[in-house]
Curated annotation (Swiss-Prot):
Keywords: Amino-acid biosynthesis, Aminotransferase, Histidine biosynthesis, Pyridoxal phosphate, Transferase. It catalyses: L-histidinol phosphate + 2-oxoglutarate = 3-(imidazol-4-yl)-2-oxopropyl phosphate + L-glutamate. NCBIfam families: hisC (TIGR01141). This is Histidinol-phosphate aminotransferase 1. One of its GO terms (molecular function) is pyridoxal phosphate binding. It comes from Nitrosococcus oceani (strain ATCC 19707 / BCRC 17464 / JCM 30415 / NCIMB 11848 / C-107). Disulfide bonds: none annotated. Pfam families: Aminotran_1_2. One of its GO terms (biological process) is L-histidine biosynthetic process. It comes from the Bacteria. Pathway: Amino-acid biosynthesis; L-histidine biosynthesis; L-histidine from 5-phospho-alpha-D-ribose 1-diphosphate: step 7/9. Its cofactor is pyridoxal 5'-phosphate. Belongs to the class-II pyridoxal-phosphate-dependent aminotransferase family. Histidinol-phosphate aminotransferase subfamily. CDD domains: AAT_like.
Length: 370
């Protein structure tokens, strides 16, 4: 059979791979359940959407869609360089920050190597390592977040990479500046730390690290960020990495040509200039987080305190069943069973009316289980 032959020919890491499962799209829910006006609070998107300046920039380049994009992303790299105060040759662009997570692994990881990440980590980390045929080491979490001391102890001569998310997805926990820098200082130079800061713009904590200041001190540090979250450009897929220039050069060697499209490049460059949209997004998130967590407390539900734009809550029963019942009422959240949290669901902070709809439906669903 042709199908079974392909399964036999597939690389060992791919044969046993379970594909990454994104949040269910609204269109799919409405097709399956026949509901209208569904609310999606599953994928940590900005409920305000993109900056108007980003939308204008997209329209401005639509007419040039017949041309290939700037493969080096000069304009965006220049804007990022000015915004972040770092040289452009330390910046690598990706089709979402997931590209950068992969590029680093492809540059450094061979099957004999090991990669370390935390127990409750972004699902893509172990998937990437499995594809490459290397060994992944999930270090047990501490308080739903990273146990940095245990992660240092897990490092050996075969370790090449450590993934750290700050804030962490899916739990929303975060690492203080002093503990994270102590972790960096304790690692041998042959181990690259990929610091995933997809949600850093949402953090409002005095002890949250300004990691870019560490770049000259720790050449084995790479920072990844995205325009998919607070900048509201998830549908265009664009992110960036900041690293030592030599690592940036190596990642550009494995980066596919024209991996970032013209619309994304223009939108991201414009979005960097719209500070008002960024502030509005933060305010909406802070208000929405308070709205959700107050409701959880009123319902007697425990939640993991989060500094990001989502919160993970213990629904005191099967998270999968609660998720399915929420779907029937037209609300999409994210079940956490696949992350080892079978009684939890993760909820993106939405607009006030979206949060209110979710809270109302959650009350109904929980009552159905009583």
């Amino acid at each position: 059979m042709a199908e079974s032959l392909f399964y036999q020919l597939a690389a060992a890491g791919v044969q046993g791979l379970t594909p990454y499962q994104p949040g269910k799209p609204i269109e799919e829910l409405e097709r399956e359940y026949g509901v209208r006006g569904a609310v999606k609070l599953a994928s940590n998107e900005n409920p305000l959407g993109p900056s108007p300046m980003a939308i204008d920039a997209i329209y401005g380049v639509l007419g040039e869609s017949g041309r290939y994009p700037d493969g080096n992303g000069f304009a965006l790299k220049t804007a990022l360089s000015q915004c972040l105060g770092i040289p452009a040759n330390q910046i690598t662009l990706g089709n979402g920050s997931s590209d950068l997570l992969e590029f680093a692994a492809r540059v450094l990881i061979s099957p004999e190597h090991e990669v370390i990440y935390s127990q409750y980590c972004f699902a893509l980390y172990p998937l990437l390592i499995q594809i490459l045929g290397a060994k992944g080491h999930a270090v047990p979490a501490k308080g739903f977040g990273h146990d940095l001391e245990a992660m240092v102890k897990a490092v050996n001569s075969q370790t090449r990479l450590v993934y750290i998310a700050n804030p962490n997805n899916p739990t929303g926990t975060w690492l203080h500046s002093d503990e994270l820098e102590a972790f960096l200082a304790a690692l041998p130079e042959h181990v690259l730390v990929v610091l995933d800061e997809a949600y850093y713009e949402y953090v409002n904590e005095a002890q949250y690290p300004y990691s870019l200041a560490w770049m000259s001190r720790y050449p084995n540090l790479m920072i990844t960020r995205t325009f998919s979250k607070i900048y509201g450009l998830a549908g265009l897929r664009i992110g960036y990495g900041v690293s030592h220039p030599d690592l940036a050069d190596l990642m550009n060697r494995v980066r596919p040509p024209f991996n970032v499209n013209s619309l994304a490049l223009a939108a991201a460059t414009a979005a960097l200039q719209d500070h008002d949209h960024l502030q509005r997004s933060r305010k909406v998130n802070q208000a929405g987080m308070a709205q959700l967590t107050m409701a959880f407390t009123a319902l007697g539900l425990d939640y993991i305190p989060s500094v990001a734009n989502f919160v993970t809550v213990d629904v005191k029963q099967s998270g999968d069943k609660v998720y399915e019942n929420l779907l029937r009422h037209g609300v999409i959240v994210r079940p956490m069973t696949g992350y080892g949290l079978p009684r939890h669901v993760r909820v993106t902070v939405g607009r006030e009316e979206e949060n209110a709809r979710f809270i109302q439906v959650l009350e109904t669903v929980l009552e159905e289980f009583r």
